[in-house]
Amino acid sequence: MDIFLAILPAIFWGSIVLFNVKLGGGPYSQTLGTTFGALIFSIVVYIFMKPVLTPTVIGVGIVSGLFWALGQANQLKSIDLMGVSRTMPISTGLQLVSTTLFGVIVFHEWSTIISVVLGVLALVCIIIGVILTSLQSEEEKNAEQAGNFKRGIIILLISTVGYLVYVVVIRLFNVDGWSALLPQAVGMVLGGILLTFKHHPFNKYAIRNIIPGLIWAAGNMFLFISQPRVGVATSFSLSQMGIIISTLGGILILGERKTKRQLTGIVVGIVFIIAAGIMLGIAKS
């Protein structure tokens, strides 16, 4: 039962972008709707959990939420250019590398020889995985498609910065996840509005995309529930499995077309990235 709870964040988070794309509306309406969904869920959780909200918790939570919105908005823009099945493995790999390096440099997470060896192997696996999932078909090598890929990667780098700050600012100030949930959601909505208001995102698609926001917040909640039961290392490792759902869902559910060579690269690349996530989880423990 505990392992099942720990897998739920991966299931929920892995399906978010599939819902975003299926519900439609483009990256701006999708971002805004998702943030409102997260806010609704967080308000309900706050009513039942009643965590203590200090000025530090509120401030840090809002900043974290603002940067989450930056990460999510740019991830969705990249999906618009490159598709789910290509964007998500690369995005996951970049997030793992950035958060790992930050953890090593700032928090000195790799304190033993075993953790250093596992960590370095994990980073190598991530690089291999990202390269394999980025393989282009001959058709995609034309000028327009190649331009979309380059722009998508640049946008993903911005997204990675957003997700990195979203994660590490909470840890830097040692803020409890339950306490940060509501302020985070407020920051997400503020960030969503600031990033999208010029593009007139307030429409029926924004309302539809409240659903992915509810799903994201539920995944967050199950992560908080599972961590004390299975440990941070195991919950972190299992949460990376969402890449399977999002990537294969992009191909099977959204109908993104891939050559046999690309499919092989994606499957093998996912295996490398998941292996890296597991090794990083062990290195953190």
Swiss-Prot record:
Keywords linked to the UniProt accession:
Cell membrane, Membrane, Sugar transport, Transmembrane, Transmembrane helix, Transport
Q: Which GO terms describe its cellular component?
A: plasma membrane
Any single GO molecular-function term of the entry would be:
carbohydrate transmembrane transporter activity
Location in or out of the cell:
Cell membrane
The residues the entry assigns to the signal sequence are none
Q: Which residues cross the membrane?
A: 4-21, 26-48, 52-71, 84-106, 110-132, 153-175, 180-197, 210-227, 232-254, 266-283
Tell me the membrane topology, using the record's own terms: Multi-pass membrane protein
Q: Which residue windows are coiled coil?
A: none
Answer yes or no on keyword Cell membrane. Answer: yes
Pfam families xrefs: Sugar_transport (PF06800)
Primary location recorded for the protein, binned into one broad class: membrane
Function, as annotated, reads: Involved in the uptake of glucose.
Q: What family does this belong to?
A: Belongs to the GRP transporter (TC 2.A.7.5) family.
Its name, as the record gives it, is: Probable glucose uptake protein GlcU
- What lineage, starting at the top, does this entry show? Bacteria, Bacillati, Bacillota, Bacilli, Bacillales
What is the name of the gene encoding this protein? Answer: glcU
